């Protein structure tokens, strides 16, 4: 939510005037997102469940743009990337409830969902969700996610990221590191520190492009 603070009504109006499609997502941020990573290995850090809501119009816009998006904030990232794995679960053809679509912390990395994902494009995953809404007469998807995005994660939907500067030993910094494929985040943060950028929720922002 805090990355969006940089988008004033004037900025949003200019984006709309340029013909850029934009949508809003809902994710109820869990405390685990901000809990410092104290474990020696990331496998020892537990993410809390976060509840999400995505409207039909957002899914239709994603399909229009081949399931590619610029995310504003790490909250949007977790929502969009979780959508992909929810769509992967629907590829099975089984009749699932919205609760069944919950994305567990390590599902993108290992197990049957990760194996199925190898054969499901982001576009197909979003189409699966839209078809699910059609079958059940729903206008929005309500589900949950425990996803953790860390180095080694393969981004599916998010192609660019607008985000603030995060504190050390945080899952948010892990997410940024994964987005930039490892090393480049050090250079960005060194530059920010040497030029007195402001960090955290009310600080400066960045546009990250892998």
Give a label for each model feature.
Residues 1-210:
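Surface-exposed, charge/polar-rich loops and edge strands
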């Amino acid at each position: 939510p805090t990355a969006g603070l940089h988008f004033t009504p004037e900025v949003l109006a200019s984006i709309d005037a340029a013909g850029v499609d934009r949508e809003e997502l809902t994710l109820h941020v869990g405390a685990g997102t901000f809990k410092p990573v104290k474990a020696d290995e990331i496998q020892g850090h537990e993410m809390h469940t976060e509840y999400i809501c995505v409207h039909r119009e957002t899914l239709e816009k994603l399909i229009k743009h081949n399931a590619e998006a610029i995310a504003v904030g790490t909250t949007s990232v977790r929502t969009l990337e979780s959508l992909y794995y929810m769509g992967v679960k629907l590829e099975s053809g089984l009749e699932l409830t919205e609760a069944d679509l919950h994305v567990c912390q390590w599902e993108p990395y290992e197990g049957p969902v990760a194996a199925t994902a190898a054969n499901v494009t982001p576009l197909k995953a979003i189409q699966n969700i839209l078809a699910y809404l059609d079958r059940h007469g729903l206008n929005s998807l309500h589900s949950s996610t425990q996803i953790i995005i860390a180095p080694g994660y393969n981004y599916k939907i998010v192609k660019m990221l607008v985000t603030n500067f995060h504190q050390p030993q945080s899952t948010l910094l892990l997410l940024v590191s994964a987005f930039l494929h490892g090393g480049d985040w050090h250079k960005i943060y060194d530059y920010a520190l040497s030029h007195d950028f402001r960090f955290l929720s009310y600080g400066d922002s960045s546009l990250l492009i892998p």
